[in-house]
Curated annotation (Swiss-Prot):
Acts as a chaperone. This is Chaperone protein DnaK. Residues 598-655 are annotated as: Disordered. One of its GO terms (molecular function) is unfolded protein binding. It comes from Chlamydia muridarum (strain MoPn / Nigg). The gene is dnaK.
Amino acid sequence: MSEKRKSNKIIGIDLGTTNSCVSVMEGGQPKVIASSEGTRTTPSIVAFKGSETLVGIPAKRQAVTNPEKTLASTKRFIGRKFSEVESEIKTVPYKVAPNSKGDAVFEVENKLYTPEEIGAQILMKMKETAEAYLGETVTEAVITVPAYFNDSQRASTKDAGRIAGLDVKRIIPEPTAAALAYGIDKEGDKKIAVFDLGGGTFDISILEIGDGVFEVLSTNGDTHLGGDDFDEVIINWMLGEFKKQEGIDLSKDNMALQRLKDAAEKAKIELSGVSSTEINQPFITIDANGPKHLALTLTRAQFEHLASSLIERTKQPCAQALKDAKLSASDIDDVLLVGGMSRMPAVQAVVKEIFGKEPNKGVNPDEVVAIGAAIQGGVLGGEVKDVLLLDVIPLSLGIETLGGVMTPLVERNTTIPTQKKQIFSTAADNQPAVTIVVLQGERPMAKDNKEIGRFDLTDIPPAPRGHPQIEVTFDIDANGILHVSAKDAASGREQKIRIEASSGLKEEEIQQMIRDAELNKEEDKKRREASDIKNEADGMIFRAEKAIKDYQDKIPADLVKEIEEQIEKVRQAVKEDASTTAIKAASDELSARMQKIGEAMQAQSASAANAQGGPNINSEDLKKHSFSTRPPAGDNSSSTDNIEDADVEIVDKPE
């Protein structure tokens, strides 16, 4: 079979906490691509079941029976230290552990997986979805991230794309992508707010659009606020109600919790359209008196009360974003709603309260981000003309200076790409070296901000305190990823650092993970093909036994015996885990035997027609029991080994 030709398309991927979506420019218009399951969004879930790695809908379907090996909402852990995710760990059934560098990783069957690896599995699924639609190999993508993602989270997302075999041309914030999708065909100047409440994060961005220029004026948000948190308040309510009714605490039962998670998500969605919903979970647990059932009614008013503190948390970031943009709510022409949680009536009411106007509901909150990413892909690929995107950094960047002070070099909401330089000096006489501690955040003291990297500038010539001239340069690229350098004017000595993902994956390790992913892809494909052949064999046995039962009195006894013997051969081949070739051969032989049923029945039908003047066998039944089709083998990529390394890559460049 010939290789697919390489596509010149740059696809757009919304890598979401709960769901992901892929889009591509086609004929000058963005198109959302449906998955192999026929859905326009794919659950951002990866599961490990035996030797198989499941992604998307298949992973979600088995989550209740396999909670500890089903990884959902992993985006909340990407680019973060274990010490930063205590609250998130409490909400997931799988094991989150620190690796040797203190990064948050997932432990499944004594194997560690980084959030980048799991993200890569989802991105591979999106890549394959696009390739199946285009009929070409896709190698380039624009991937979206929450606007309030910090530098290491952005770098981690880019690494996930590379592991998935994608050249990530640009990382852009989700609200910015949504604004692109909204404003690409709009005329005139407008100031818009994008209110993005997704599965795991909340972002608010203020933009000015006009004449093809999309300028982000400010951005703010909360990376710990999203649909998962709304699910959690319903789960806690259900746990409390069930404990009151039955005296049983379900909070330590992972299988029950996964069922409650699914029920909470379903109830949350339903309550956006109805005033109350029934939650029924039969046989949720069992005690000495027998099985117990959970049956509750949750009203919209109750849910809004339970979630009131979460909804309230969206107000302050909106106020800050308006303040940073030097605008009032009345200056905003339109408010876009993005993310599944923006469908909640109480959320929409708060948006109206904040901005003093009804929000725009003309975009699909589940798809608009992927559409915007595809448009940006079109801009980068030259397919979309006369569009300029001016983005900003969400948090200030600086270094630690004397007294443990955070000295910003680049203020938040600075348009990127950008470069800033500042001269620093030593704090002691004859100081031979300085440590450059790179920080991100808004607090005045260094310890209260996030350290995203550090490096040493050594061999500074002896000089009195304050005399050496050390030029520190911050260079931020269009992806919002930071490069820092420090140069001593006297010696010409310079050191540089690229702020890496906190997982600390080195370049060669990323390349190894890419190679591993490709190797595992072929192995997993073989496993999937073997699984499909076994499933088809089981189906063939079922159809053959049903055909014998239905038509035993219409076919010769020796044929019945022949088929029963072949059924047993197929069953034994499957049971003994024979080779796929042997199972397929036995199944094909059974299929041939089953065709004899049709031939025998047709002969009997013809004989009856001659004797009685007409047929007496239903032709649809003949088709149903005489033929089988083998579905095409699927494809699924297994995960790569966990790799750990230092937080940053240091390059010495002495002059």
